Amino acid sequence: MDFAPSARAQALRERMDAFVERYLLPHNPAWHRAVQEGAYPPPFMEDLKALAREEGLWNLFLPGLRDDEPGTRLSHLEYAPLAESMGRLPWAAEVFNCSAPDTGNMELLHRFASPAQRQQWLEPLLQGHIRSAFAMSEPDVASSDPTNLQTTVRREGDTLVVQGRKWFITGAAHPHCRLLIVLCRSADDEGSGEPMPDSHHQHSMVLVPLDAPGVQVLRNSSVPHQHTP
């Protein structure tokens, strides 16, 4: 396999490096001051995002974009050097709409969302109008093994009811966060007459609006050397 960057990827890398040098590095001290003072995201972030989009440095991570969706449609191999360039600053990826957990969430929605879900969630995420979070970790279990998860989902008529507690959910306290993708286990529906699947086939990812009834963000946990929510 040829790992040499394509001409297109090389040109984008040069534009990315120039953008980081010209716009992001000069803002780095102000970014750190702002987040240490609790002013996250700093007010200049939206201006930088608009500049990045004008430069064609937007949604660089998703190769399967449709023609009407904003982005570059790079392969993963082409994206790799751009990710390296963004890695010069811990906050740079957000400027290019390439920050986690939104990248993974957008890929999930791009592959599996219904047309209504695409319109409600994927389109504003691709535009950078909202942020999202992926809720997996839980306080009382070793959550890296999904079979340990205690959060459940059950169906009541046309409604899905999610019950549980999550923590260390990157982005959940971001002021622009509007969507949680919550990893749950199927609740045991005693009245259904259906046998429960085994522990490795009980999981679902549920789209939960942050303003849905019953959703509470109780606190923003502090993490060493990380000030973003």
Model-derived regions, located:
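Intrinsic disorder at enzyme termini
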Residues: 1-14
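Buried hydrophobic positions in well-ordered alpha/beta secondary-structure cores of metabolic enzymes
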Residues: 9, 20, 56, 82, ...
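Short secondary-structure junction/hinge motifs that connect adjacent elements
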Residues: 26-51
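A short, Trp-centered hydrophobic/proline-enriched beta-strand micro-motif
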Residues: 128-137
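Cytochrome P450 C-terminal beta-domain/meander region
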Residues: 142-163
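A short core secondary-structure module
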Residues: 159, 163-218
